């Protein structure tokens, strides 16, 4: 039995993993890659072109695990908007969560927002201005889904009081200055957001794909946020450019993590 078989067995034996099962699982490239990272033989992994997001995440959760103090791993996209777009910062925005958490609770949504801001700052190189989105702007609608966003906004501000963040905001109020001024005149974020946090995975996944296909924006990711080591997923509809850019993102994540 090789070192990697033994390592995976030790990680999963409490869950009923056998030595024979570990040997078989390690032949799966998703698990082998994560074990190489865990053992210090690799710095990051890019996968998903031929695998489902669920399979990629399962291997990462079992072997890499979340960062210390982090309970929510989420997925963000760095959106590279068409030249001349009036939105975002230098043609860039971050969308989250578009890949991992189906229906986040208010505390989970708050953590996704804070993680997305970090992604914008570290990988996008711009100062994040975070909007937590809803179908309501500042009380324009009453619903339990709106209440969740309001609570998430409150928690996120407590988690990161220095962060430029607001909610609940409708999408147009978040990114269009005139609409933001009209609908949320007291908000410092309305009309100028460059990080959009969606209330559910359903909304986030649909939105990033529509923006990508209808506007010609490039969607780099999903960038997995909150893992102890860089593991990133690709859409099975990805192009070679998507793979190339995600590899660069993963390398940057590794370099930055090693500098801390």
Where in the sequence are the language-model features?
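Anion-binding alpha/beta catalytic cores of soluble intermediary-metabolism enzymes, centered on
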Residues: 4-190, 195-260
């Amino acid at each position: 039995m090789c070192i990697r078989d033994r390592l995976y067995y030790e990680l999963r034996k409490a869950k009923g993993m056998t030595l024979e099962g570990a040997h078989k699982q390690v032949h799966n490239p998703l698990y082998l890659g994560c074990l190489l990272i865990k053992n210090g033989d690799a710095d990051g992994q890019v996968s998903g072109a031929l695998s489902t997001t669920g399979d990629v995440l399962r291997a990462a959760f079992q072997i890499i695990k979340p960062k210390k103090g982090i309970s929510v791993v989420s997925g963000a996209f760095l959106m590279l908007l068409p030249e001349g777009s009036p939105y975002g910062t230098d043609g860039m925005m971050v969308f989250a969560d578009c890949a991992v958490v189906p229906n986040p609770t208010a505390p989970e949504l708050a953590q996704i927002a804070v993680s997305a801001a970090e992604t914008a700052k570290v990988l996008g190189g711009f100062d994040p201005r975070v909007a937590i989105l809803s179908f309501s702007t500042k009380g324009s609608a009453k619903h339990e889904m709106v209440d969740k966003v309001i609570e998430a906004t409150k928690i996120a501000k407590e988690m990161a009081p220095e962060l430029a963040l607001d909610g609940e905001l409708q999408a147009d109020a978040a990114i269009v200055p005139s609409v933001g001024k009209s609908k949320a005149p007291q908000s410092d974020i309305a009309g100028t957001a460059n990080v959009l946090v969606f209330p559910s995975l359903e909304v986030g996944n649909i939105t990033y794909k529509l923006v990508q296909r209808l506007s010609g924006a490039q969607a780099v990711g999903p960038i997995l946020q909150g893992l102890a080591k860089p593991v990133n997923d690709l859409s099975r509809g990805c192009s070679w450019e998507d793979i190339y850019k995600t590899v660069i993102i993963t390398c940057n994540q590794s370099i930055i993590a090693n500098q801390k």
